[in-house]
């Protein structure tokens, strides 16, 4: 099965980027314990402080689904509730 990736753009309320970055950094540390989460990166656009991106890679689509229903993502959602204006993910198959 091909690896699976998700590229997420998170639009946040002005003035809350540091809070979102802190929450994402904690989430990144927690997902290291998810055996089929291969990579999780937080990206900061240079020219837009109302957006944060994440790049996520999983063993396969089933691993991504497990991540979506896992405790770390539930905690992240709680931590950033009310300050995320819009969230857009692009689900991808990784070409080897």
Feature names for model-found ranges:
Residues 2, 9, 41-50, 75-96:
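Glycine-rich beta-strand-turn "strand-cap" elements at beta-sheet edges
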């Amino acid at each position: 099965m091909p690896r699976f990736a998700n590229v997420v753009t998170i639009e946040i309320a002005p003035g809350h980027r540091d809070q979102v970055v802190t929450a994402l950094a904690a989430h990144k540390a927690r997902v290291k314990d998810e055996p089929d989460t291969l990579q999780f990166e937080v990206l900061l656009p240079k020219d837009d402080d109302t957006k944060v991106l994440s790049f996520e890679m999983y063993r396969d689509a089933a691993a991504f689904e497990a991540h979506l229903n896992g405790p770390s993502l539930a905690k992240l959602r709680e931590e950033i509730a009310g300050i995320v204006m819009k969230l857009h993910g692009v689900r991808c198959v990784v070409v080897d």
